[in-house]
Structures are given as C-alpha cells and as structure tokens.
C-alpha cells in the first residue's frame, strides 16, 4: 500500500489526511507525520498503519491531557478518568501518563500539597473532609498523611472557629446550649474532630452571656405567643413552652422568665 497524497486539514492545520492508493485512509498529528517520515510514495504495510494509528491516538490524547491540565493541576487519577471519558484505549492512557510524568506534568505529592493548602485557605474545611477528597482523587494514604500534617492544630482551630461564627449567625434564635450543639454537629460534618469542634463552639459562643440569652428568649416568647394566640390559654402556654424547649431553653428557665416578667396566657378582658 502506497501513500498517494497528503493534505492539511482545513479546520486543524496541525493534522494531516493520509491517502493510500488514491483513497483517504487515516489522519495524523504533525508530530506523528514527522516521526514516521510519512510522505507521498512511501509504502506501508497493515502493521505499519496500525502502529501509526496507535501513535496518533497517544499524541491526540496527550494534547487533550495537556489542555485539560492547563486549567488547573490534576492528580493522576483525574487525568486517567478524563482520558477514559475521551474514549482512549487503555494502552494509550498508560503511554500518555508516562509521557506526562516524564514532562513533569504529573506529581501527585505536589498536587496533594497544593490542593490541601488551597482548601485550608479558601474553604475552611476540616482535615477529615480534605482527606476524603484526596482519597477520591486517587492519592495514596502515604501522600495524604504527609500533606495533612501541614494542617496545624492552630490553623484547624482558627478555621473551625470561623465556621462556628458563621453557624452562630445563622442560628441566632436558639439558646446557647442548643447553639453549641448545632455548631459541634455541623463542624464534625465539615471534617473536624469532635474535640476540636467542642473547642471552637466554646470559643465562638464565649461572649454570649445571660443577658444575651434572656433577650433571645424574650423575642422567641413574643413570637411564639403571637403564633399560638388562636389556641386556648392552657394549650397556647404548652405549645409555647414546647417550642422554646426545642430551641434549647430549659423548662425551668422558661418558667422563671414567665413568672419574673408576669407573662400570662390568659385573654385580656
């Protein structure tokens, strides 16, 4: 089989159409064209053509991978998954990854280190969440352990406290005890240890005093009483107390406040 003509593709000047015996047969990247010295008149066997096509697949995949990496640093697993979605053959994926590694495009430790630092600074995530994300990205336990060590206890407490302050602002209608429990639960879900979550909850709510809680209780009593005024006095009182207890106020605190402020559920005559 002889190459009878070669033409540049109109939409991609770096790719060439190869015609064998006057018929289009395949296309190749410019680098593959030069490597195999493809030119008019060259004779190729079926095995030659198959080898060239495989080399072109690797080259095409390599170009796609480099473009994929141009947006941000990726782990080896992320690149492998991307190439699979591009329907690359397994042999091509392995070859592409080797080439990328030789070109210093892949370094899982550097990726993990950069990813961890970014998450610490920009997302305030806890170490367990970051560890889980690194596992999903295909990093080894050894690499994960090394980079997580850089997340100091001081930085964890600082980030957890910042998260706690945000949680507190969103839940400023609850009693201090309930608020602290909410903070602890949310922080554990965000990847912090229970011990550190408790410390952050204590730190975030440290400035809440009895007066603050009394003010919150007053507002909640007024709001709940308005909501329940359509009920009989005894039912309205019970519903109000139940609602307040669900927000973390103790029964004794509620009763004391009602008594001290002479709040009655009886209808005014």
From Swiss-Prot:
Belongs to the RecX family. GO terms for cellular component: cytoplasm. The keyword tRNA processing does not apply. GO terms for biological process: regulation of DNA repair. This is Regulatory protein RecX. NCBIfam families: PRK14135.1. It holds the Pfam family RecX_HTH2. Modulates RecA activity. It comes from Listeria monocytogenes serovar 1/2a (strain ATCC BAA-679 / EGD-e). The keyword Cytoplasm applies. It comes from the Bacteria. It is found in: Cytoplasm. Keywords: Cytoplasm.
């Amino acid at each position: 089989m002889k190459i009878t003509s070669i033409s540049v593709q109109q939409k991609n000047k770096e790719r060439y159409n190869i015609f064998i015996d006057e018929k289009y047969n395949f296309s190749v990247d410019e680098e593959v064209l030069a490597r195999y010295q493809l030119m008019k008149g060259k004779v190729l066997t079926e095995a030659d053509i198959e080898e060239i096509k495989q080399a072109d697949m690797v080259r095409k995949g390599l170009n796609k991978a480099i473009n994929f990496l141009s947006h941000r640093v990726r782990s080896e697993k992320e690149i492998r998954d991307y190439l699979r979605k591009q329907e690359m053959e397994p042999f091509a994926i392995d070859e592409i990854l080797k080439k990328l590694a030789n070109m210093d495009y892949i370094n899982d430790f550097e990726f993990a280190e950069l990813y961890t630092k970014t998450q610490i600074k920009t997302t305030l995530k806890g170490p367990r969440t970051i560890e889980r994300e690194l596992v999903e990205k295909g990093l080894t336990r050894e690499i994960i352990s090394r980079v997580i060590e850089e997340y100091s206890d001081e930085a964890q407490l600082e980030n957890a406290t910042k998260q706690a302050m945000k949680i507190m602002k969103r839940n400023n209608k609850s009693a201090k005890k309930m608020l602290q429990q909410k903070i602890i639960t949310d922080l554990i879900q965000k990847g912090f240890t229970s011990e550190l979550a408790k410390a952050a909850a204590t730190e975030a709510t440290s400035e809440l005093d009895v007066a603050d809680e009394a003010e919150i209780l007053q507002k909640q009593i007024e709001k709940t009483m308005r909501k329940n005024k359509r009920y009989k006095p005894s039912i309205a009182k019970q519903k109000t107390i139940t609602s307040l207890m669900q927000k973390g106020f103790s029964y004794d605190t509620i009763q004391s406040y009602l008594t001290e402020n002479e709040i009655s559920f009886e209808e005014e005559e």
